[in-house]
Swiss-Prot record:
Keywords: ATP-binding, Kinase, Nucleotide biosynthesis, Nucleotide-binding, Transferase. One of its GO terms (biological process) is dTDP biosynthetic process. ATP binds at residues 9-16. Its EC number is 2.7.4.9. GO terms for molecular function: ATP binding; dTMP kinase activity. The gene is tmk. The keyword Kinase applies. HAMAP family: Thymidylate_kinase. InterPro entries: P-loop_NTPase, Thymidylate_kin-like_dom, Thymidylate_kinase. This is Thymidylate kinase.
């Protein structure tokens, strides 16, 4: 047996951090586990990530954005996720197809039926076994992201640039991308879309308050994953 767990949530909810903590815990416990992310996770998907999230592409059409995310996802599923699941491992993914429904569907108003068809084509119908939703009020999450952005800029200014290496532009800041910069109303629609999806499929989704202390949230996630590990063989 294998296990496919995805992390979803508003911007700044701590998905990436908690996914790393869970990966480290499972690895130390002897489970075969990998952590990947969307968009990204392969050289091709990472190239798409740089394109689709770059702040300079303000004129990108919603349909173009949707198809780029789907292309990155197709590569990640085919190259990384499916092969590891077939080996009986645990795959943790920081965002997956639900992000498309939330952002391009509810956020940008793309047709949800069409998005489901695109997603089915890109993933071969692969669904997560479990999705952890880290919930946080939109403004609180964006405040966290702004702080991360500002800290990044400050540290970049303090560091001495190496003349033989290309220096990142502000648009390449992983802590603040083209989607982060959208208006509050967009992010509110995204969060509302997530909540609708959770209500429609409560067996797959587990909701956590991302506003609590980081250590407490980690403990809750570790407890939540335990019942799903009974069929996974450890490496030892």
């Amino acid at each position: 047996m294998s296990l496919f767990i995805t992390f979803e949530g508003p911007e700044g909810s701590g998905k990436s951090t908690q996914a790393r903590y869970l990966k480290d815990y499972l690895q130390q416990a002897g489970y075969p586990v990998i952590l990947t992310r969307e968009p990204g996770g392969t050289p091709i998907s990472d190239a798409v990530r740089r394109l689709v999230l770059d702040g300079q592409w303000t004129a990108m059409e919603p349909t173009t954005e949707t198809l780029l995310f789907a292309a990155a996802r197709a590569q990640l599923v085919g190259e990384v996720i499916l092969p590891y699941l077939k080996l009986g491992g645990i795959v943790l993914c920081d965002r997956y197809a639900d992000s498309t429904f939330a952002h391009q569907g509810y956020g940008l108003g793309r047709n949800l039926t069409e998005l489901r068809e695109i997603t089915r084509f890109a993933t071969g119908g692969l669904q997560p076994d479990l999705t952890f939703f880290l919930d946080l009020p939109v403004e609180q999450g964006l405040q966290r992201k702004r702080k991360q952005r500002d800290d990044f800029r400050e540290s970049s200014q303090l560091a001495l640039p190496l003349p033989h290496l290309p220096q990142p532009s502000p648009s390449q800041n992983e802590h603040w991308n083209r989607l982060d910069a959208r208006e509050i109303a967009y992010h509110e629609r995204v969060r509302s879309g997530y909540l609708e999806m959770i209500a429609a499929d409560p067996q797959r989704w587990q909701v956590f308050d991302a506003g609590i202390e980081r250590e407490s949230l980690t403990e809750q996630l570790l407890l939540a994953v335990q019942p799903h590990l009974t069929t996974i063989k450890t490496l030892s």
